[in-house]
Amino acid sequence: MLCAVYKSRKKAETYLFIERREDFSRVPEVLMSTFGRPELVLMTKLDPAKPLGLASTERVMSALKSQGFYRLHTTWKLI
């Protein structure tokens, strides 16, 4: 499964995975307004056998199939 990954210019460390590049039709308007103008970071092929760095590949794939997008917000803590 291919997907496009965008980062938010409004919210630091916030990413949006969608099924097709530039197709935000299944992303709720309220999410798009808080996300801001998306910036393409990566096009990738999702494979359950290959882990993603910050999210469960299976969870991302499931969300893409069911709702058309997956939002990821990361927080980094220095120890």
Label every PLM stretch briefly.
Residues 23, 31, 56-60:
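Amphipathic alpha-helical interface surfaces
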